[in-house]
């Protein structure tokens, strides 16, 4: 057993434009090599594109949260060794990890898209996620399908 203490969670400040902590988390995940202003520009630009596309009443922050909620997984499978055999055991995902996975999947799906700028790719992936389609939503569906297929091993949960 490890004798180390658990690392203290750092407080994340809300983003300057919308005052939202989740958007800051998203920017931090998107950021490469500490280039926060570049990540900020991409996220704010993508949200602006979403606002323009959604009409005058569209709230980009609400759309962002809706997209994130549509990508969050409820269950996932974790490997568990029992008597020489490895079972994929479905377990419920903690709220914190749920958010982290959704953010990671949205960014990965955006990076794999074919549009020219990251801003376009991100806004299109977010719009797809709002409408329950796109690669990130497919990833969540696949995860849920795996958990459903391995439901028989759920008694191995720890």
UniProtKB/Swiss-Prot annotation:
One of the protein's GO biological processes: translation
UniProt xrefs under PANTHER family: RIBOSOMAL PROTEIN S7
Subunit structure: Part of the 30S ribosomal subunit. Contacts proteins S9 and S11.
Paired cysteines (S-S): none
Function in brief: One of the primary rRNA binding proteins, it binds directly to 16S rRNA where it nucleates assembly of the head domain of the 30S subunit. Is located at the subunit interface close to the decoding center, probably blocks exit of the E-site tRNA.
Single Gene Ontology MF annotation: rRNA binding
Family stated for the protein in its record: Belongs to the universal ribosomal protein uS7 family.
Keyword line: Ribonucleoprotein, Ribosomal protein, RNA-binding, rRNA-binding, tRNA-binding
InterPro entries membership: Ribosomal_uS7 (IPR000235), Ribosomal_uS7_bac/org-type (IPR005717), Ribosomal_uS7_CS (IPR020606), Ribosomal_uS7_dom (IPR023798), Ribosomal_uS7_dom_sf (IPR036823)
Keyword tRNA-binding recorded: yes
Gene Ontology CC: small ribosomal subunit
Pfam families tied to this protein: Ribosomal_S7
Protein name: Small ribosomal subunit protein uS7
Keyword Zinc: no
Species of provenance: Gluconobacter oxydans (strain 621H) (Gluconobacter suboxydans)
């Amino acid at each position: 057993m490890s004798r180390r203490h658990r690392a203290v969670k750092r407080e994340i400040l809300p983003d300057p434009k919308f005052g939202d902590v989740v958007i800051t988390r998203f920017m931090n995940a998107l950021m490469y090599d500490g280039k926060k202003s570049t990540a900020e520009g991409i996220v704010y630009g993508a949200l602006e594109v979403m606002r323009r596309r959604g009409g005058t009443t569209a709230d980009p922050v609400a759309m962002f949260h809706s997209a994130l909620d549509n990508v969050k997984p409820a269950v996932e499978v974790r490997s568990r060794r029992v008597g020489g055999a490895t079972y994929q055991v479905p377990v419920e995902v903690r709220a914190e990890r749920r958010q982290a996975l959704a953010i990671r999947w949205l960014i990965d799906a955006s990076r794999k898209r074919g549009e020219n700028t990251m801003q376009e790719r991100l806004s299109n992936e977010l719009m797809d996620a709002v409408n329950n389609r796109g690669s990130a939503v497919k990833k969540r569906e696949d995860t849920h399908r795996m958990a459903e297929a391995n439901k028989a091993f759920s008694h191995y949960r720890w």
